[in-house]
């Protein structure tokens, strides 16, 4: 996980700091799960598509990162005598295994996330129904429990050395974006002094999802516990879509109210981003430059500032 992924429209780049300390950059095309632009750009729906695509791209990126640390094992296999046909079959088999593993990991990740961050808070909140009669209060309590579990999880894994490095690369990603969005050349020195906090962040998105879910779940008024669970699951895509629209608005607006509502997400980034070192910043710069010609963009911002 020694790298940074940057996406610009239908192109994305993955820059990795290899074990030999060289930076390797891979640029790929990603058209998305829905190719019809009218459907892809529909409010709410675009947030659902973006969320799913982020999961898929995330798994592809992690698989690519891991490949650099499996090179020695692969090299040993290549030393074994094989015919060209046997090698081709072996590569096809490994590709199928990789795709199956990636698909299984995505499904498992979604199931675990729903179980821990959606279902567990719901069932814990039902324990208070004997002493709290208001369904509004129970729904609010469920949301508070969900936030505590989520923030606790983020804080706990930040204690792990490897995850801390992931958070440092996350910081490098934000600092690179902030650097060019503030009209500065994309250099190590400029990136270093840029902020590691950014409104359009996946961390902020997840927190907004938690907060928006409180509002939606307050209006679920059915007696059947099973039906309440089913309705929560069905509302997840809608909640993700609404949350995406807010994050999109926050990234484009300097409105005082929007800035205030964005604060919790920025505070949470205090946990999910750390100050990167210069080598990490170099990786971030390589990733940006692979998919985005930042110089004309920076020039335009400078003209607007005059």
Write out the residue ranges for each language-model feature:
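Hydrophobic alpha-helical membrane-embedded segments
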Residues: 11, 42-64, 142-167, 240-252
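Cytosolic juxtamembrane amphipathic/interface segments immediately preceding
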Residues: 35-41, 86-102, 188-194
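Hydrophobic transmembrane alpha-helix segments characteristic of membrane transport
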Residues: 70-97, 102, 115-135
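Select subsegments of transmembrane alpha-helices in polytopic membrane proteins
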Residues: 99-117, 198-209
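Polar-ligand-bearing catalytic/cofactor-coordination segments
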Residues: 2, 6, 77-81, 132, ...
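Juxtamembrane "helix exit" motif at the C-terminal ends of alpha-helical transmembrane segments
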Residues: 64-68, 109-134, 209-231, 237-240, ...
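Divalent-cation
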Residues: 1-78, 84
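Residue-level signature of transmembrane alpha-helical entry/exit and packing/kink sites
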Residues: 98, 102, 106, 138-146, ...
